[in-house]
């Protein structure tokens, strides 16, 4: 990391030194043209890169005026496969057409793990020092110094190690296979809180182990107590094939639910719990057949789950544990009607008959207001400076005009060392165009966004993870929750209009104690978030460039503008870390929730209930 950091520090965006030669990468959508000699190239001599960048930006701008997508013609990748790919065949036994031979059982009130399978263990846990299965980094021990605030009645004492009790013994075996040595701060508290039967609202900095924070205690309690009796079926025989999960995890995007499912497979390995995943954009018939084979822990995107409930394929009558991950993003994306339909209108046990856990890196007041309907006597857990960034991330803000962004990015990539680089842009067409430019400059890159098919997105993510294409250009679809090992550099090519999105984007690096670098291209078009950006840098003890201070002073003449400010409740971002029950005054009326649906970036909330539409989020 020091090599990369030194390279970035010494980077001169006006440097005319030619980049080192790279092997030509030909993506599948260009393979035919390359074979026939009809491929196009936008390459320019390295010693005139800045002028070439301006020309490319001009082409990019014109493509919008002409309603053209640019030269990026199609989706990347031709199918599922590869290590850990989400193939619909035999995926370690969990998706096969037969019972996984390593699956455990629950007999006479006791959990009986299944036999070990070395091939499955290598597939889902990797081997020691496998870079694709990154765990903790050199700064992980610093997490012990992070302040933790837990508020509520009778807060259980935190744990300091993975032990039994409170964790079930077989879960400890799987945690050891995953090479997790000690709990993160959020896990130290969440495990005893859930074991005590309490509800939880947990806020923790991104990369702090939130997924383990809910999977560990939920699976542990499931292993201890076993499955619930399945209700006796009634009605036609063909309606009997219905899943009755005991745990439900809701998350906003396909990528995040897929990632949580992959983690659930690890920690449910050889247990009686069979995890399943459902999300839009994939074959619903295959998903229905999969859950019919047994589903004890269901990870789901809200829209697809509503569809399966309506089809009579999933019942929520047996739910003991409900987890809402990235709850603020689900509301921003307009999922509140679906979430309320799932929790309050689908036969799920009421708030007093289940445990409910809400996890996210930010919990603004409108989400805490939602908690009064979904949680009972909950514990509010704030780990570190929630809504801020990790000091493991070195943040650099460069002043770059729009017309110079391409050349600036090319210079950064030329100086980059080993590791993965994630580049964020604001638009889908912008992602495709920039990816095409990078490929024409011999940088192996791919892209993901909401218009890509699920097959193409999974393939692109897999090739990014394994380093085949170490540069990924992404829109906000990849910004929240994804845990991709070895992302050493995040570039905000286009800064978002919401500072929380910035926090989540750069949180793709510097995870679990590892270090990373985040570079942002800033100009006066981003003055709406300049004050909050300065606050973020100061909170993480980063350098604040003079041009940010100057822009902030200029913006002050126009009043205290800025981004969304998380609902404008009057305290800005810092108040999103607090338990509003301590402040008194109540939460107001339920009618306030009507304004939460349909964030400005995602359209109206009602569109997410239309399963027949061309919707990329459910």
Swiss-Prot record:
First-listed, main subcellular location of the protein, grouped into a coarse class: cytoplasm
A molecular function GO annotation: RNA helicase activity
Record domain Helicase ATP-binding: where: 191-381
Location of the motif DEAD box: 325-328
Domain of life, source organism: Eukaryota
GO biological process terms held by the UniProt record: cytoplasmic translational initiation; negative regulation of cytoplasmic translational initiation in response to stress; regulatory ncRNA-mediated gene silencing
Name of the gene this protein is made from: DED1
Annotated residues for binding of ATP: 204-211
One Pfam family it belongs to: DEAD
Xref: SMART domains: DEXDc, HELICc
Catalytic activity of the protein: ATP + H2O = ADP + phosphate + H(+)
GO cellular component: cytoplasm; nucleus; spliceosomal complex
Protein name (database record): ATP-dependent RNA helicase DED1
Family: Belongs to the DEAD box helicase family. DDX3/DED1 subfamily.
EC numbers: 3.6.4.13
Composition bias type Polar residues, residue spans: 37-46
